[in-house]
Regions:
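N-terminal ligand-binding lobe of clamshell/alpha-beta domains
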Residues: 1-269
Length: 269
């Protein structure tokens, strides 16, 4: 018996018939890239302005706003059969409105690196790209194994305590219950714990915080931190500050395979 294809909120999705014409709109940048990696770019009819990879493939695809402020009327005009969304990245009221006229709304929510495997298989299964999905799974497994084999010395040395910053004015970070924190944990980097229960808490710089971290990480997205920000903050706080590629750490989907290799480089630098 073929396994049911259930998304992140438990909704079961039918497999697309080979003769059925799919029209996909993606509101999730990393999932848009994954759709293309699965060979489904010809079915993609709409994307957000933040869906930028692969660049040449996506240039002719219509933009329908941002991840938080989509143009509902434009999506309606595109008449999608499938909508790809994410619990963290898209607004639920917007998704609820879109679900009234889009037949299939596929909800994603990877919270750990290994969740990429089920994501590949979910989308590959729905759209008849099982072979492509399994190829991605194999590549992910190889990259994860290579990363794990490079880490025994790091594990013996104990965790490296970090604060991963995603925004300033106000300063914001991530909780340990996030994909980002669990990616960092693969190389023994332990994300700072906030007193807040929010997944993306606001924080203030103070001595207790600084006493409990070894290094500050500034992500290149969603806030566009630069080396200039890193240098200024290091002078101000007297703690090591490093700029990291946010796409490599936070993008799940096919980008996660490159992300694992990037983590290996980070851990050895």
């Amino acid at each position: 018996m073929t396994a049911a294809l259930r998304d992140a909120i438990g909704v079961e999705h039918p497999r697309v018939d080979a003769a059925q014409e799919c029209r996909i709109v993606s509101l999730v940048p990393s999932v848009t890239e994954l759709i293309c990696a699965l060979g489904l770019a010809p079915a993609l009819v709409g994307r957000t302005g933040f869906c930028i990879h692969p660049r040449l493939t996506l240039e002719p695809i219509p933009k329908i706003g941002g991840t938080k402020d989509v143009n509902i009327d434009k999506i309606r005009q595109l008449a999608p059969t499938h909508l790809l969304v994410n619990i963290d990245e898209n607004e639920k009221p917007t998704v609820d409105t879109l679900s009234r006229f889009v037949p299939n709304v596929i909800v994603t929510h990877p919270v750990a690196p290994e969740d990429n495997l089920s994501l590949y298989r979910l989308l590959g299964g729905i759209f008849g790209k099982e072979a492509e999905a399994e190829s991605l799974c194999a590549r992910f497994g190889e990259a994860l194994s290579s990363l794990q084999q490079s880490q025994p010395l790091r594990k013996k040395a104990g965790p490296h305590r970090v604060l991963y910053c995603i925004w300033q004015d106000p300063w914001m970070t991530v909780s340990r219950d996030t994909y980002i924190a669990r990616m960092l944990a693969l190389i023994g980097w332990e994300q700072w714990i906030s007193a807040s229960e929010a997944r993306y808490p606001v924080f203030r710089w103070d001595e207790p915080l600084l006493d409990n971290i070894d290094e500050i990480l500034l992500s290149s997205e969603p806030y566009r931190f630069t080396e200039a920000h890193a240098e200024a903050l290091e002078r101000q706080l007297g703690k090591p500050v490093r700029l990291v590629d946010g796409e490599m750490v936070s993008w799940y989907g096919s980008r996660a395979i490159e992300g694992l290799a990037y983590l290996r480089t980070l851990s050895l630098s």
